[in-house]
Structures are given as structure tokens and as C-alpha cells.
Amino acid sequence: MKSFIINLSKISTSANTASNLKKQLEEFKMPVELFEGTYGNDAVEMMEKENRTWHPFGIKGPDVIPDPAARPNLKGNTPGVKGCFYSHFRLWQKCVELNEPIIIWEDDIVLTRPYIPIEWTDVLILALGHPAKTEKYRHYLENPMGIPKAKPYFQSSMPGCCGYALKPHAAKKLIDTYHNTFLPADNAINQHHVIIEIHSHVMGIALIKKDGKKSLTRTSYWNKL
């Protein structure tokens, strides 16, 4: 299964972490490519040209998340979030174009083990991200037990999008859902639209959780250029 690492090559920190992740995946004999992400300021311009608006509902259902135009300081209404969404959206398109499952990585991941092939339905979490949403699954990384398989994931949306596998039919669902709208990428992938599962032998962990480093959308990576 092909892997794609979202990488912002004009930002040295992103380029370095992406290069390190690529080396880890190559050591595991996994096909991997660097994928140039969408910079935040570019995403803002693209959304204006496309008249792309905030999706009418989020992880808790219709009319729960307000339109960011009415709240300029809303967390989701930032160049970083928009650039991140576009980067993932373009890889959903790549998945459909290839017509095969792919793995999508953000660059700030440290891996523990290679991918162990299993069956899953739509979306499969492969790396631990948001601490509050993944703490109960920590043993899948540190002390996995039993036969590797897809396990239920009980949160409404992704715990960040630092590492996940995606099937073409699920990618198409997401593309159709957000063809002219957007949400933060992790909220966009939610169980109103796709089934989210987690690998019982998780591959890695985001640096935000391992070393206390900030995630991509909380740094200037996405909107610096």
C-alpha cells in the first residue's frame, strides 16, 4: 500500500521531519512519496475563488458549529486549518484517482513498527495523535496483544490526521461531502460519513504527543508562506 507524506518543503522544519519519516518508512520497505502540501495563504485564496464555505454541520451534527465568517477568531477559521484541509482533500482525490487504498501521513510522526496488513472498512487510524482522544488506545502502540485487526474507534471524529489509511470508496464519500465546503481535516473525517477504526497494532505516534511539540496547524508552518 502506497504512503504519502504531507510535506511543506519551503519550511525547513517540515522538510526535515518529512525526510526523517520517509527514511523510517523506507526502512520498513513501504512504498512512500513526499506530497507537497497546500500552504495556508494559498488555501485562503483558493477557497475564496471556489466560494468554498464552512460545512453546515460538524462532528456533533447539523447546526452545531457556527459559520466562521460570523466568528473571525474561531479556531477553524485560520489559514493553517484551511491549508491542512486542502492537503488532505487533495490526497483523497489521489486515492480515488489511483483506485486503491493509500496511507496518508502528516510529517511529524515517529514510527514504532511497520504496517501489518489487516482488513478494515473505510478509514483506519495508524498513528496516535490528540492525547484526549487516544490515551485509551495507547497500549495498541506500546503493548499490542493478540492477532492484528481493525478495532472500533469510539470518538465521533479523527484524533488528528497524523496517520491513517483510506479506501477509495471512503475517499469519494469525503470528496462528495466537502465538494464545496470545508472543516478542520480531523473533524471532516467523522462517523456521520465514514466508519473510523483503529489498528490494534498502531504504527506510531505524533511528535505533539511524544515530545510535547506543537502540531502543524498550531505552528506557522501552514501560513508562513
Language-model segments: residues:
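An acidic/histidine-cluster motif and surrounding catalytic segment
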Residues: 1-105, 109-225
